[in-house]
């Protein structure tokens, strides 16, 4: 039976049976509108709104079990990963779900002829008037204008669905963008800006002639499974300046001459952030001359490009840091640079995830996410917006590193849960997803106290609270916190929690940077982590007074983060032709990802699969990491928040990588 005939059949049955349209409703989603959208006016009730209803996926109650079956070291199916097609089929909305939602639409006066189902079967599309949409969703639509792009969008702050279909609806969005009044920018006014969720970065300039120790050349390659430190002598001054040598010494990261052809590591950057080729060569010339001229593989998503129009630390520092260290630590493995977003609309994680999974494309939300195709006209020498949409057009690398952190309260819980499920799906396919935890302890990116607590789907003002970061709070990613070599210490000393005060060049402004960590207000503690978080809370209560402004719903029951840590202090980085010291967990994430990439390489050479989602293995075997038991992160009042301790803690997680111990463990697994 065709979809259209099926819809008419439902409509006729409902009409003939005289079902009443007087239904009970419940708020399905309430959202906090981002600050960059400003309300302009009520929408014209006769304006047409394209609505997308994403149908609830099936088997969600089993999703975590599916992931654990391939990532729990005790599972007989460990590392028996699924194909992308198998994942899509397992979670595709069922036919009964579609019928339930269609019955609601029909009872609400929406004729079947006006409803179209997507090819994947996961969405229902309709084009109805604003007045009809408001009646259907028990809401009010307003026109909002984006403060940076001048685009306008129809947005409702909350919407409801009939109670009997609530569990069958994932989310509902309108994709209508009203482009009248779109401002043409001049080349002198491109309005470059940082991607959402990213501060400009933290660095101190370092004169080349102050470089504290000479370049150390590579040693010869050794066997596949054993590590060789770069030089016979250990690097010095790593408490003052981190280099690739320091990281190899700290974490026993190997040096190789070859890598498995199927191995891969991806680094994600969002426009306007991009590396400079001259910076890569400057870095390699100092630390690894044989790599001069090497470049990462480039993959453009939704118009992504390597931005060189506005060279500055804000736009080049992050990408230079990520790619310089990932390439140096994993050479000769090929690194992929995923560049997301065109010059006008930028890009974010949802755009990236949609490029990997065509069933996720409807989840790209115009309130939070850039929408492609981008209709912005060309303004020579600047190009027009990207005139297509990369929906399921790319493949994931085996490890993906992302040095971006958002505040969990920036998005609706429904948005975050839907995105989190995509990370679970990547884990099912054997992909390791690594996120930086953030650099501001339990405060916001601006060092402020949080004032929003999310309870289920409701958002309400609350007393000052700790601010967890997302996606680190998603239980299906590996969150990386920060550490540093203790003052006047060496690479042989145990590291301490990352805690650095950065002072501006004029000495007037200082900022405290500490490893972000804490507990989610949206996601419950996962089973693989439950013992670790319970033990930490017991130690915390026995040794310290609980933080005074810990007014969060997730404390003791929410997903704890970070999971692991790596050095985050004073990375020697070539940026805009200068050598600078860069700080933050932005550095920690690609370092940990590089360790995982080398473990994958060894497993692939033995005919095994990559390690995929590593958290269950690491929490079951914390002894393979270097425990960090000193230091703390800080809150918005510049007071200690959580303390590092033996075992897992919400500052440094389970600790820093020890490649040799981790490798031995993962090679023992099937």
Curated annotation (Swiss-Prot):
InterPro entries the record matches: Peptidase_S8/S53_dom, Peptidase_S8/S53_dom_sf, S53_propep, Sedolisin_dom, Tripeptidyl-peptidase_I
Location of the Peptidase S53 domain: 241-669
Catalytic activity as recorded in UniProt: Release of an N-terminal tripeptide from a polypeptide
Record's keyword terms, sorted: Calcium, Glycoprotein, Hydrolase, Metal-binding, Protease, Secreted, Serine protease, Signal, Virulence, Zymogen
Compartments where located: Secreted, Extracellular space
A GO molecular function held by the record: serine-type endopeptidase activity
Note accompanying the cofactor annotation: Binds 1 Ca(2+) ion per subunit.
Active site: 318 (charge relay system), 322 (charge relay system), 586 (charge relay system)
Main location as per UniProt: secreted
Disulfide linkage: none
Name of protein: Tripeptidyl-peptidase SED1
